Every structure is written in structure tokens, then in C-alpha cells.
């Protein structure tokens, strides 16, 4: 029984190993939509968000691992959702926060399973 559990954990680990390509493929729709920019620099990937009103970049994040890239894109996506769901500039309600967190958690799982985002 112990061997089976260890094998399953090993197998889950192998499946869930992320690569930069997996993350970029998973979030291609978010990147193409302009939620964030992802650039490959000589130091690695960078995720940048654009503030249209201020006309400047903000939240520039260096991502040295695929997991860091996934989290930076998810953070930008959460910010996008917050702006989309909360149109009257109030602080998010607990329900709105839960909705954003659930969508983000679902996308994290999708990315870990090498899936692809199909809806913003």
C-alpha cells in the first residue's frame, strides 16, 4: 500500500512539472487579450502590466521559474477580474473576492494539468 501511494505521488509530480512553454500556452489567451505582457529578456521572463490611465508600466515581475511565471500571470489576471467585476470603484465584497480567488485557483489547476485557458 505504501508503495502505491509513493508511486502515485511520484506520478502526480511528473505530470505536474511545469515548463515555461506550458505556462505560456495555458495563458496565451490572457496574454493576447492584453491583460499583461510577457517578455523574454536575457535574464529570463518578465511579466508587465500596463496602466492605460497613467500611461505607464506597473507590477513588473521577473520570473525565474515556471511557477513564478504562472503566479505573476495569475496576479495580473486577478487584477483584471477585479477591475472587470467591480465597475463602481467600491471595495470588493467577500463574494466578489471568493469569485476571483476561485477563478484564479481553477486556472492554477488547469495550468498544472497542462490545460489551456479558453475564456477570459
How should each PLM-predicted stretch be described?
Residues 6-33, 117:
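Negatively charged, low-complexity tracts enriched in Asp/Glu with abundant Ser/Thr
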Residues 14, 59-61:
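Short N-terminal micro-motifs specific to bacterial/archaeal maturation
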Residues 34-57:
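Short aromatic-glycine-(Arg/Gly/Cys) micro-motifs in beta-strand/loop hairpins
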Residues 61-120:
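Mixed-charge, Lys/Arg-enriched low-complexity segments
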Residues 30, 44, 76-79:
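Small side chains
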Residues 11, 52-53, 63-68:
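A short, sequence-level motif marking secondary-structure junctions
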